[in-house]
A protein has these predicted regions:
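Class I S-adenosyl-L-methionine-dependent methyltransferase catalytic core
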Residues: 2-187
Length: 187
């Protein structure tokens, strides 16, 4: 049974200082090798990118900011999501909802921040969390299209699956080097 309660809402606080321009704050894209690693590790072929734009989507079907993934119908069974990091809580709640109520498998790429309510929601509802160690993901700058080393937090992959038994969370760890090596060697 999922921990998500009907109509449950929270207010999230932004507590991390960043040098990123406010206009670009939530526009950093996932490197392809991270996406490919997630597909390989979880044995999933994603068919929906739930938080993307035309120029950075990882699959053909995607939900743009204008379409609003928090309200849009998710037309996919295996969903990838790298949500805006300024306020991930509503996206975590939406991923849990889609998994529990609509039989979707969702993998989220999130910061590691054990002090937040959304992290607690992940721990309570996810089937697996993969912590990325040894370095931080060099996200793709929205303006330049290049990987950047300006990331100031570690990341994790969070797997939500339908009918995952409550309290069955598995924690795993992968070094960024291994992740990149395996992600680049797919196909």
């Amino acid at each position: 049974m999922a921990y998500l309660l009907k109509n449950q809402t929270y207010k999230a606080k932004m507590m991390t200082k960043s040098n990123t321009k406010k206009s670009d704050k939530d526009l950093w894209a996932t490197p392809w090798w991270v996406f490919h690693y997630a597909e390989k590790y979880f044995s999933i072929k994603f068919d929906l990118d739930a938080c993307a734009m035309q120029h950075n989507t990882k699959v053909k079907k995607f939900i743009s900011p204008e379409q609003d993934t928090l309200t849009a119908d998710w037309q996919g069974r295996y969903c990838w999501m790298n949500p805006p990091y300024s306020n991930p809580l509503p996206f975590v709640l939406r991923a849990i909802q889609q998994s529990v109520l609509h039989n979707k498998t969702v993998v989220m790429l999130l910061n590691v921040d054990g002090s937040t309510k959304w992290f607690d929601m992940c721990v309570r509802n996810a089937k697996e969390i993969v912590y990325i160690t040894n370095s931080r993901i060099p996200f793709i700058n929205n303006e330049t299209g290049e990987e950047t080393d300006q990331n100031n937090k570690p990341q994790m992959l969070v797997l939500f699956e339908p009918k995952a038994p409550y309290g069955s969370l598995k924690s795993s760890y992968v070094s960024l080097h291994t992740m990149k090596e395996q992600g680049l060697n797919t196909k």
